[in-house]
Curated annotation (Swiss-Prot):
Disulfide bond positions: none
EC number annotated for this UniProt entry: 2.1.1.195
Protein's organism: Paraburkholderia xenovorans (strain LB400)
Matches recorded under PANTHER family: COBALT-PRECORRIN-5B C(1)-METHYLTRANSFERASE
Gene3D superfamilies in alphabetical order: CbiD-like
The keyword Transmembrane helix is assigned to this record: no
Pfam family, one: CbiD
Domain of life the protein comes from: Bacteria
Protein name: Cobalt-precorrin-5B C(1)-methyltransferase
Pathway: Cofactor biosynthesis; adenosylcobalamin biosynthesis; cob(II)yrinate a,c-diamide from sirohydrochlorin (anaerobic route): step 6/10
Catalytic reactions of this protein: Co-precorrin-5B + S-adenosyl-L-methionine = Co-precorrin-6A + S-adenosyl-L-homocysteine
Classification via SUPFAM superfamilies: CbiD-like
Length: 372
């Protein structure tokens, strides 16, 4: 028999970033090379000072087969299973691993292993050609390896290769290809901890998408809630993928980022229901944080001539799409009305030099409202 759902759900469990996994595995592999001790657990210190033991699934010596006289042919590798807690992270359950070699020159050199991408476009925090290992994870690894070197009186350096098993396929489910990060995933994290449903990585990718487009000379961007609205903007303006920002429910992340990274023209396009939430002042369009206000839609329709019968029908509608269809049948442009209110909300946030416009679509991606 199926168990009852508890009235009070258990607290959501936090997890650890790929940056934390990379730090633990690189530390364990380096320690094996310097001490001969293979670890089952690697304890790391997160940026805010928390000490975290990370279990390892392997820690072993390997033969790199390298002929460089300035480095050791022998290396070591260690791996851990990425635990994202209760966050719906694409990398949850993947094996993140590090391969480490000792080199003569002090410091740490980073390389992209299997499943980790390489930066191919300007506009990110990393230079073109660099492995997609973000600055905080790089610092975490560098700090831990420097401390280990001091403990062991080791004066050389480390070559660290980070990989993710299956990462090339997983990366296709992320924004990396559009950002110009090719061949795999990014090694991410600023605190070392994944907060369930914080969506910080998604919001960061939205900001990166805007930054990359600007750095590559694009002055007109379209931020879209999903595939249908994105297809509508691609067809309407002929914009390339790099200029199409997949914002999902996070329209606020796009609008607020315009203060730091403005563009000449910003087109916001989304399903009618999503845009009706923005029109009501909501900047997070997810159903758990905002809802469609049919009463408000009826009031707006009334301002443009809807009779009492139509107002009542809109209030009683099963969906926002039904509401807009009822209005259109009586020549009340509810799609345009919602776009005008959404545009007013957006203009109150973005700098005046950003020319914003709104587009609403139906479920098939047809444009059913606009405001400029």
């Amino acid at each position: 028999m199926r168990e009852e759902t508890p009235e009070q759900p258990a607290p959501l469990r936090s997890g650890y970033t790929t940056g934390s996994c990379a730090t633990a595995t690189s530390l364990a592999a380096a320690r094996l090379l310097l001490t001969g001790v293979a670890s089952d657990v690697a304890e790391i210190v997160l940026p805010k000072g928390q000490h975290v033991p990370m279990p390892l699934v392997f820690c072993r010596l390997i033969d790199n087969g390298n002929d460089n006289d300035n480095s050791s042919d022998a290396g070591a590798e260690a791996g851990t299973i990425k635990d994202a807690g209760d966050d719906p992270d694409v990398t949850h359950g993947a094996v993140v691993f590090a391969r480490v070699r000792l080199v003569a020159a002090p410091g740490v050199t980073f390389r992209a292993g299997p499943g980790v991408g390489t930066v191919t476009r300007a506009g990110l925090t990393l230079a073109v050609g660099e492995p997609a290992i973000n600055p905080v994870p790089r610092k975490m690894m560098t700090d831990h390896l420097a401390e280990l070197a001091a403990e062991q009186a080791y004066g050389g350096g480390f070559e660290v290769t980070i990989g993710v098993e299956g990462g090339e396929a997983l990366a296709l489910k992320t924004m990396n290809p559009r950002l110009g990060i090719l061949g795999g995933l990014s090694i991410l994290g600023t605190t070392g901890i994944v907060r369930p449903f914080s969506c910080s990585a998604y919001i960061a990718s939205i900001h990166q998408g805007i930054d990359v487009a600007r750095a590559n000379g694009y002055t007109h961007l379209a931020a879209c809630t999903g595939n249908a609205s994105e297809d509508a903007m691609r067809a309407h303006y002929g914009l390339p993928d790099i200029a199409l920002i997949e914002m999902g429910d996070f329209v606020g992340a796009v609008l607020k980022h315009m203060k730091r990274a403005p563009v000449e023209r910003l087109s916001i396009c989304g399903g009618f229901g999503k845009l009706s939430k923005l029109a009501a002042g909501h900047l997070d369009l997810h159903s758990r944080n905002s809802s469609i206000d049919l009463e408000q839609l009826a009031q707006w329709a009334a301002e443009y001539g809807a009779d009492t019968a139509l107002q009542a029908a809109i209030r009683a509608a099963n969906t926002s799409q039904q509401a807009v269809a009822l209005a259109r049948a009586q020549q009340v442009p509810l799609g345009d009305i919602v776009c005008r209110h959404a545009l007013a909300v957006a203009r109150a946030i973005v700098p005046p030099q950003v020319n914003v416009e709104m587009f609403a679509t139906d479920r098939q991606g047809n444009l059913i409202g606009a405001a400029q």
